Amino acid sequence: MNSIKATKGLLALSQQDDLMDLTSNYPLSASEDEGDSDGERKHQKLLEAIGSLSGKNRWKLPERSEAGLKVSEFNVSSEGSGEKLALSDLLGPLKPSSSLAAVKKQLSRVKSKKTLELPLHKREVEQIHREVAFSKTSQTLSKWDSVVQKNREAEQLVFPLEKEPSSFAPMEHVFREWKARTPLEQEVFNLLHKNKQPVTDPLLTPVEKASLKAMSLEEAKIRRAELQRARALQSYYEARARRMKKIKSKKYHKIVKKGKAKKALKDFEQLRKVDPDAALEELEKMEKARMMERMSLKHQNSGKWAKSKAIMAKYDLEARQAMQEQLAKNKELTQKLQVVSESEEEGGADEEEALVPDIVNEVQKTADGPNPWMLRSCSRDAKENEIQADSEQLPESAAHEFPENEENDKPVAEEDELLKELEKRRSLRKRSELNQAAEPLGNQETKDSTSQEVLSELRALSKKLSKENHLSKKQKKSPAKAVDLVWEEEPAPEEDEPLLLQRPERMRTLEELEELGKEDSLPNKERPRPSVEGEQVRRNPQNHSKGKNKKEQMISLQNLLTTRTPSVTSLALPTTVEELEDEGARDQKQMIKEAFAGDDVIKEFLKEKREAIQANKPKAVDLTLPGWGEWGGMNLKPSARKRRRFLIKAPEGPPRKDKNLPNVIISEKRNIHAAAHQVRVLPYPFTHHQQFERTIQNPIGSTWNTQRAFQKLTAPKVVTKPGHIIKPITAEDVDCRSSPRSDVPVMQSNPKQHSKHQKQRKKSSIG
């Protein structure tokens, strides 16, 4: 069967070959070309059928080819087998023949015809155009990046940015082209030219120009140094005058005025010695000015100007000073000139020195440190003692001049007795000081205390003497008045209190003053103390026993800081120091109660807090409407049941911040005015919120900063000069350089978009 099939196939193949020969010998048409393609397909099927005749696949034996000298048509070399066959290679042998011109035209027509690509979508085309336009505009705008960055980082911008060159042209160049136009200007210039006057005001005169040309470099340097020195001295004198003008001390101005008067007198004396005639003329001028001032009263603040200044003197400091200067000038002019000799000046100086007593100098030497309060009190006591001493040492001539002092013989005897008592007390105190040597007090403090004791005793004695003399005179004149009251300070007992705890003065009658001598004669006897002191002893007996041994001390910083505030029970009784803490707290509470007795501050505060809490609470919504489901009208209220039904309770809000703070009210309302000044976005120069907060926390007011720093902090960001035209900036004004972003091409800046376009083009071409 297989052989029969094979023979049939061979017969069919042979017939097909014959047909192929016929077709090759005759020209082919278009229909014949289609049939030829079908024959090739059939021939291919025949070969496949022949290959499948044997069920077994034959082994292909390897063939070996060797190079030989003879080349036959059956042995073709395989050179260039890897290269592709081009259409030009096939058309090469057909060129000389003209019969194949039509075939050549057909082939060239087929070669020239190509498939056209599909056009892009309209949106894609517009996107590409936008990218190209963006690249061009970004390249042009990037030239201004440096300028914009510089203007943003600048602390202050001053427009116009172009600064006009400041050139100082001399007046000759300015008026060179100017001409007189009006008839008045022409007449003025004609007069100037006729008289050969300079029309302009040159900086340097011809003489100065000649001197500059004649001056050498060294002379110019010396001249400049002299001018600099003169300017410096002038500035020093001006600063000194300003400082002296600001001094408000009356004593200083009095001394300056005295010095000026003395200097004027000395100059006048010198002028009188040198030129008597000129001195007489000067004296006549001064006397004439004094007379004119006394007649006219020009500087007595009685004119229109002075009255207008007097109205504003209460508010204006300059007006007040002007009025004072007027009065001072009036006093100076109306004062008669008195020439004081040198002997009188020396005598006046001696008198001033004699006014200072010796005891004041002694106290100043013994005083520890510059304590002006103690020195002032010492000087006051010393002056009183000095007056008493002067009254004792009056000469006989003074006694004759004052016959009224003849009655003072009796008080002098009493004074001697008091001085003796003073000596006794001083000796007793010295002994007590020797016994109390173990106390932690320095030698200097003891000296100060003794000096203070002496001064206080002298003061008390002098007061006693003067008041007793005064009372004795009054008793002689009016003996019926026996209850006159005088101010008198209690004499210091043995247990001297500190200066801070001294008792105030109180009134004493004449009977008490008569018994004063008896009490002074018994220094060791204890006097009855007030009732408050007894209560203090009962409360704290230990402190009272210690206080007996203490003596009068100066002000000490440690004692002042450690002592508590005393509780004053009565103004006429001595103050007591409460050492118990509960007593001090009770007194403080009592004082606060007395201060706020009429005002119930706590209740008002609690009421205000309750109102604030109620105002901030979420309120319920009442949806009841009158007339719905029941009668409505005037004076008809909806029932409570209906209200409860239509009442929507609001949810409770978060707890208040001041819930556990009874003494504080914290407002939780949002302040709209403050919210307008809050910043939601971080400003440009700052990179972190802490930097911005730190700058906001710093104060910029003039209270906390210097004037220069305040002006710098509050300087405006942009300043425009008035009257100047602000023109737009151009590329010629600024050296603009393009930034690196413009160098990147458009397609490179977005490669994904570019690849997307390429894929779409390929798909369209394949389709």
From Swiss-Prot:
The modification Phosphothreonine is found at residue 205. Transmembrane segments: none annotated. Residues 23-49, 338-554, 730-767 are annotated as: Disordered. Ubiquitously expressed. Residues 753-767 have a biased composition (Basic residues). One of its GO terms (biological process) is rRNA processing. It is found in: Nucleus, Nucleolus. May be required for ribosome biogenesis. Residues 317-346 form a coiled coil. Interacts with DHX37. Residues 342-355, 486-498 have a biased composition (Acidic residues). There is a cross-link at residues 122, 447, 518 (Glycyl lysine isopeptide (Lys-Gly) (interchain with G-Cter in SUMO2)). The lineage of its organism: Eukaryota, Metazoa, Chordata, Craniata, Vertebrata. The modification Citrulline is found at residues 431, 586. Its main location: nucleus. This is U3 small nucleolar RNA-associated protein 14 homolog A. Belongs to the UTP14 family.
